Design a protein with these regions (language model features):
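A short core secondary-structure module
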Residues: 60, 69, 73-113
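Short Gly/Pro-enriched turn/cap motifs at secondary-structure boundaries
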Residues: 36, 51-54, 78-81, 92-93, ...
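A short, charged helix-loop
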Residues: 127-153
Length: 300
């Protein structure tokens, strides 16, 4: 598995299909969701901008009402699937506040570019797109998306999935290191027979189990409809840290061979650098938890 593939699926489901399902009209759901579920229509989620990442409420993208249509101008950056998407979920500022729009990527004035030379999530297409007087009809506005809370709710859905994906990363790194050490002789016995390495395996397994339990608890909260954003922030923050620590430890347990593309831990470590950044950085999730604990929003 690879976090790049999980990112593609996460964007398609949590960031594109979810807002249509939750905030869209019945006509929009019928038009877009079947094709997206079948993989025949690819979506991307346009929230992050070149100058606005952790503070989406300051976004510069604007949508202006002109009769029965909207005119969109602005740019979005670090967008998964940009360049291959058929439809973009675009979040923009309007005179009435934040709104969401369905923007076909073949619209006149819409241009997407792929971001090159990434060292992370190389299996995922990442890009940016620009809108220069892009026109969409009123029927392409998500009617129930009427505040910044709408895109943030989509991020909560994606973060929920990340909490589980991070456990998969840790497990693959654990298994890769264990297989390697069981078969690698050194000083007349396998690397896995040395005390220091057994302790490292015990530490990875313990933290991985803790992360898995937290993800399972998150799932139960979601099924009970009692899940709240700070629950998701805690799991995303914790489990991503567990995953990247497991990847780095596993890489080190393979010695120089660990930097080879033959083995997965270093690839996972590179990918997790991105995963720890998108859908809210580790620090932002710490502040979300801090607000829940103290009642004081430190970032406002």
């Amino acid at each position: 598995g690879d976090s790049g593939l999980r990112s593609f699926v996460s964007v398609q489901g949590s960031l594109c299909m979810f807002p249509i399902w939750k905030y869209g009209s019945e006509e929009q759901k019928e038009q877009w969701l079947p094709g997206m579920a079948a993989g025949e229509i690819i979506g991307c989620f346009g929230l992050t901008e070149p100058d606005h990442g952790s503070d989406p409420s300051s976004m510069a993208t604007r949508a202006k009402k002109d009769g029965d249509r909207w005119i969109l101008n602005g740019s979005k950056r670090w967008i998964t699937n940009a360049g291959i998407a058929d439809i973009a979920i675009v979040w923009a500022n309007t005179d009435e506040g934040f709104r969401g729009f369905l923007v076909p990527t073949d619209s006149e004035g819409f241009e997407a570019r792929k971001i090159q030379n990434k060292l992370s999530l190389r299996a995922s297409v990442t890009g940016e797109f620009y809108m220069d007087d892009v026109e969409v009809p009123e029927s392409m506005r998500l009617p129930d998306a009427i505040s910044i809370g709408a895109p943030l709710s989509c991020l909560s859905e994606a973060r929920y999935g990340i909490a589980f994906g991070a456990v998969g990363v840790a497990r693959d790194c654990y298994n890769a290191a264990l297989d390697y050490q069981q078969e690698r002789p050194q000083f007349g016995k396998s690397l896995s027979s040395f005390q220091i390495n057994q302790i490292k395996f015990a530490d990875i397994l313990t933290e991985m189990t803790n992360a898995n339990l937290q993800a399972m608890s998150l799932g139960r909260l979601k099924e009970d409809h009692s899940i709240r954003p700070h629950h998701i922030s805690m799991a995303k923050r914790h489990n991503c840290r567990v995953a990247i620590d497991a990847a780095r430890t596993a890489r080190a347990m393979m010695g120089a061979n660990g930097v080879s593309t033959e083995y997965s831990p270093m690839r996972h470590a590179n990918n997790m650098e991105s995963v720890m950044t998108y859908e809210g950085t580790e620090e932002i999730h710490g502040l979300i938890l801090g607000q829940e604990i103290t009642g004081i929003p430190s970032f406002r």
